[in-house]
């Protein structure tokens, strides 16, 4: 009887491993570049904004919308992948807001991996983890 249980257990394990997604390349937070924040007059420029968004697998416009909404300031995506914000903001404030964005809309709540994709299913935003396969709904912004 124990032989059947062992075979059954192994079959279930094989089935589980077949359904799990392939392990994605790790792109942890330590691999993220530091944001280069410059203040020119009354504007704040984030020079490597597009590169940063590419690393976290989020669209530039989505990250820009979050950041501008949190700062309550107008801004636009400039050429060469930089974000131009109307107003003076310190690099600490911008970095803190992007870290909050990472925790809320990038990091998997199950395994804490940053290998995720944000997708929209009807009116619900869902974080799909590429490392563990978990899907977590998040609130809109």
UniProtKB/Swiss-Prot annotation:
The lineage of its organism: Archaea, Thermoproteota, Thermoprotei, Sulfolobales, Sulfolobaceae. Heterotrimer composed of an alpha, a beta and a gamma chain. eIF-2 functions in the early steps of protein synthesis by forming a ternary complex with GTP and initiator tRNA. One of its GO terms (molecular function) is translation initiation factor activity. This is Translation initiation factor 2 subunit beta. It comes from Sulfolobus acidocaldarius (strain ATCC 33909 / DSM 639 / JCM 8929 / NBRC 15157 / NCIMB 11770). Belongs to the eIF-2-beta/eIF-5 family. SMART domains: eIF2B_5. HAMAP family: eIF_2_beta. Keywords: Initiation factor, Protein biosynthesis. It comes from the Archaea. The keyword Protein biosynthesis applies. InterPro entries: IF2/IF5 (IPR045196), TIF2_bsu_arc (IPR004458), Transl_init_fac_IF2/IF5_dom (IPR002735), Transl_init_fac_IF2/IF5_N (IPR016189), Transl_init_fac_IF2/IF5_Zn-bd (IPR016190).
